[in-house]
Amino acid sequence: MDTILLFMLPAGLWAQDAGVAATTAAPDATAGALGELATGLNTVWMLLAAMLVFFMQPGFALVEAGFIRTKNTANVLMKNLVDFMFGSILFWFIGFGLMFGIGGFVGAPHFFNLEAMDKIIDNGLPIEGFLIFQTVFCATAATIVSGAMAERTKFSMYLVYTVFISVLIYPVSGHWTWGGGWLMNGDEGSFMMRTFGTTFHDFAGSTVVHSVGGWIAWVGAAILGPRIGKYGKDGKSRAIPGHSLTLACLGVFILWFGWFGFNPGSQLAAATSGDQTAISHVFLTTNLAACAGGFFALVASWMKYGKPSLSLTLNGVLAGLVGITAGCDLVSPFGSVLIGAICGVVMIFAVDFIDHVLKIDDPVGASSVHGACGCLGTILTGLFATEEGLFYGGGSSFLLAQLFGAAVVGVWAAGMGFIVFKVLDKIHGLRVPKRIEEEGLDIYEHGESAYN
């Protein structure tokens, strides 16, 4: 009997070891499955957000088409189409590596080498999905310029501009911020930490996307000069109405819808309850800012001009959306209403100042909506952020960091835009001949009209 027990003992011990191994393996397998599920949810959310941001492209096209005359509609639609097509290829080929590669001032480029970029970024998301998400943001910055330079720009020169913003201007300043560069480097001893004790914050792109496009639009419109007939001999501005506020209104609603991918999608995760709470908060602050921007622009235009202007109210909605994009994750719902309201009112006066004082002809108000309000919204985040904001007892450090970051990116974008457009103007001329401008760009540039 003792002999039998002696032989059974190792078998019993082996069975216990197998049980322990099975018990250990089960949690590991469960954890792995949950990890894969979380990655899947995050990926689907990111790609869904990318689709929403892509849908902003027809929104921009309709807004710009509505704010210009019929004879130039096909031209502006073509520019919105082409900057996405060109920009997508160029950003994949060069811009993505410059923006997210390793480096302080600019990332080391890995030309169309997504395998190398995947090892560098390592954010748990498929690299191809992350690329397409970032591509639609780059395309947004590029297309902002189209409206400001509408009705008088050579199509060929616009294509050249698209190359520069997609492979250089946007990726470099994007690297400083979202690419782990010096403006958002929180390491001890980094420039921002030594200077301000905190880093620059731009959650979804008030500065990184919108003010970059807005400042380039402002510089481009200034170099290009006003449309024929915009200013009289006495220097007074003359209104040149767009041909369809219906299209413009539809475009704004599409942009508003797309912004629910632009801002909440920048969370880049949706698997945990914390992610879902953050996404919901950003949805709310984004919508409230849009509503406040539109409402206060309506009131301001009513008080200033005697009647509530639809075109200015539409731009007020966009101003609120642009303004809240930097701090939509940090501010309270009340703070988002204040940011939207301030941006909506400031947009009215920025349009007036640029048009009547600076004498810069911006047919759609892009430099006011995206440039001025993108910069302003970034700065207001330093006031209304509930943890570090000045109005919440956070001191001035965060506000100063926001001011500095917005200024640096603005100078970069405006400076590079000035160089690009000046060189193009000297080499080949930015502007179409006077006769073509008077007859319209649709037939001259494309051989077809938007309306028959």
PLM feature segments, named:
Residues 14-452:
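Glycine- and aromatic-enriched membrane alpha-helices
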Residues 1-18:
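N-terminal secretory/membrane targeting signals
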